[in-house]
């Protein structure tokens, strides 16, 4: 187990249970404490009493904009919580999302976008990048 990540909480939100389980197992193996939610509603209930160090959120869940809405609510509660949006929209439609500029982050309310299928190494790299110094 990676002790560097011990005590770091990651909230993972996705309605794809296979993806949710895969990410949870891999992040726990890397030493993170992982909480999961299968919907925007579940995640918002969790956030009432909890404060993750980073959130990994699927873009489209029970509503097409659920990930955007959840990201907005997370940033409204605490703008310092990094939000990584994951989506299959890019591979399905060819539309690309980006959060590399301040302007894009200001309306998207996410710190990074990752296209599904997400490689666990890529996700770990992003999480660790946001948690450096925390």
Residue ranges and their predicted role:
Residues 50-56:
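Active-site beta3 strand of CheY-like receiver
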Residues 58-72:
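Conserved phosphotransfer microenvironments
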Residues 36-45, 67:
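Helix N-cap/capping motif at the beta->alpha junctions
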Residues 45, 68-80, 100-102:
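Short amphipathic alpha-helix used as the core "switch/output" element in two-component signaling
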Residues 17-35:
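Two-component/phosphorelay signaling modules centered on CheY-like receiver
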Residues 1-9, 115, 119-134:
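Non-catalytic signal-transmission and effector/linker regions of two-component phosphorelay proteins
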Residues 69, 90-114, 121, 125:
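Alpha4 helix (beta4-alpha4-beta5 surface) of REC/receiver domains from two-component response regulators
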Residues 86-87:
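Hydrophobic/aromatic residues positioned on beta-strands within the core alpha/beta folds
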């Amino acid at each position: 187990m990676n002790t560097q990540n011990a005590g770091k909480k990651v909230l993972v939100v996705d309605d794809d249970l296979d993806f949710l389980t895969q990410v949870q197992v891999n992040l726990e193996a890397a030493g993170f404490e992982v909480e999961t939610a299968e919907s925007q509603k579940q995640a918002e209930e969790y956030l009432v009493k909890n404060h993750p160090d980073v959130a990994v959120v699927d873009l489209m869940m029970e509503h097409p904009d659920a990930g955007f809405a959840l990201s907005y609510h997370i940033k409204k509660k605490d703008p310092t919580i990094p939000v990584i949006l994951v989506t299959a929209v890019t591979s399905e439609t060819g539309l690309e999302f980006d959060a590399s500029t301040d302007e894009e982050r200001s309306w998207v309310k996410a710190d990074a976008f990752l296209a599904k299928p997400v490689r666990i190494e890529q996700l770990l790299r992003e999480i660790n990048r946001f948690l450096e110094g925390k």
